[in-house]
A protein has these predicted regions:
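Non-catalytic tandem-repeat scaffold regions and their flanking low-complexity/translocation tails
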Residues: 1-174
């Protein structure tokens, strides 16, 4: 509705970097979150290297997960392992988690066998739990049983319950 009009207009008439700067300086809240993620998504498709630089430059800022997620998702659709290496080098926290989720979600769509090998070799950690969550959310559309098994292997109770609920819902809709 009205909310999206200024964001769409801004993305359409600006260079990606102008749109990124504009989105970054909005007041924190829903509009800024939407602007950041939509700009990042647009930017990653138009000029990936510049989008990646922007993502790195904001990676320790509040709201960085809105940029890291879409940029990683775009990259993971082409080269998931490189995307995951990059995400691993980011500062720990919400942005890194968002990237991890997006990388494995994209990887599950591209090559689920390679993605599950990668997950199997990750040490147990919060990052692995996030990775499994992203992976199982996507895997459910191809292989719901395997997605349930993976989601059930998450070692954090809260995250495991969330993942199982989401996978179960998607499975029911399939």
């Amino acid at each position: 509705g009205m909310m999206h009009a200024p964001i769409s207009a801004m993305i359409r008439i600006s260079s990606p970097i102008e749109a990124a700067q504009w989105a970054s300086q909005l007041d924190e809240g829903f509009v800024r979150d939407q602007a950041m993620s939509r700009t990042a998504d647009h930017f990653a498709r138009k000029d990936f290297e510049a989008a990646k630089e922007w993502a790195e430059s904001v990676s320790s800022n509040d709201g960085a997960e809105r940029v890291i997620g879409p940029v990683t998702k775009n990259w993971a659709s082409r080269d998931p392992e490189a995307a995951m290496d990059w995400v691993s080098s980011l500062p720990e926290g919400k942005a890194q988690h968002s990237g991890t989720w997006a990388a494995l979600n994209g990887w599950a769509g591209k090559d689920p066998a390679a993605a599950s090998d990668y997950l199997a070799n990750m040490p147990d950690s919060e990052m692995r739990n996030v990775a499994i969550s992203g992976f199982s959310d996507r895997l459910v559309w191809e292989n719901p049983q395997a997605a349930m098994t993976w989601a059930n292997s998450i070692t954090s109770d809260e995250m495991r319950n969330d993942a199982l609920t989401r996978v179960g819902r998607s499975w029911a809709r399939k």
